[in-house]
Amino acid sequence: MELDHIALIVSKEENLAFYKKLGFIEKNRIERGYDTVVFMECDGLLLEVFIDPNHPARVSGPEAVGLCHIAFVVESLEEVMRDVECEEIRTDWFGRRFTFCRDYDGPPIELKEKKNTPEDGEKNR
């Protein structure tokens, strides 16, 4: 099994700039009468972004049952944090550095840093 894509609903076009700062590139755009669908890609990961100001705002707290957040792996947290406002960098249970940020509509997005292991020299997540 593999992940095909992640679908997001955003309230305005300006949200695309956030994902572009993470390295996503717009690949296709479909203008429909009631919304716009933008397909963005970064390193083989596809985002399907629905731009529609008529959807209700996300319930932000307390968190409800369902999807909690999405996480992207980046080369360098410091590099991303030059362009994107994030929380402080922390370390998870496995020793990986991570942080959280939000797009302009506010859903939490986790950023994890790629890490080289001295044992095998290969990158892992």
Q: What is each stretch, according to the model?
A:
Residues 8-47:
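Core segments of cupin and vicinal oxygen chelate
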Residues 35, 54-59, 119-120:
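A short, acidic/glycine-rich surface segment
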Residues 63-88:
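Mid-chain, well-packed structural core segment of small domains
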